């Protein structure tokens, strides 16, 4: 299972957001006993701002711990930044999704 974090950062907040991300990663670093980063901040520029996506694999049985870490980090990062949006979702791996339908590779 994966955790997918998506951010939308208004253009005028880009520098402040980048600084907060660096600070947030220091304050709440990834814990490789519960999560393994896959994509660490892929960014695209769009009309409404910069869209940033991070994807990490959740270690079996550590979903709550990962959500706690990610939400603490996200709340730290957005503090004082107007116009920021973010979402946190889970996604199944291909094999996990196939198992739901009784299939295997």
Please name every model-derived segment:
Residues 1-69, 89-105:
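Short S/T/G/P-rich N-terminal loop/turn motif that feeds into the first structured element of a domain
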Residues 27-30, 75, 79:
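Secondary-structure boundary motif
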Residues 70-74:
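Charge-dense, low-complexity polyampholytic segments
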Residues 76-92:
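Conserved short beta-strand edge segments in small beta-sheet-based binding/regulatory domains
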């Amino acid at each position: 299972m994966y955790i997918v974090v998506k951010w939308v950062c208004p253009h005028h907040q880009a520098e402040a957001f980048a600084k907060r991300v660096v600070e947030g990663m220091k304050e709440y670093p990834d814990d490789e006993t519960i999560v393994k980063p896959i994509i660490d901040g892929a960014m695209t520029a769009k009309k409404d701002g910069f869209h940033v996506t991070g994807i990490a694999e959740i270690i079996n049985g550590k979903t709550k711990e990962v959500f706690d870490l990610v939400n603490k980090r996200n709340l730290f990062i957005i503090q004082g930044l107007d116009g920021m949006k973010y979402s946190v979702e889970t996604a199944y791996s291909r094999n996990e999704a196939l198992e739901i339908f009784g299939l295997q590779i």
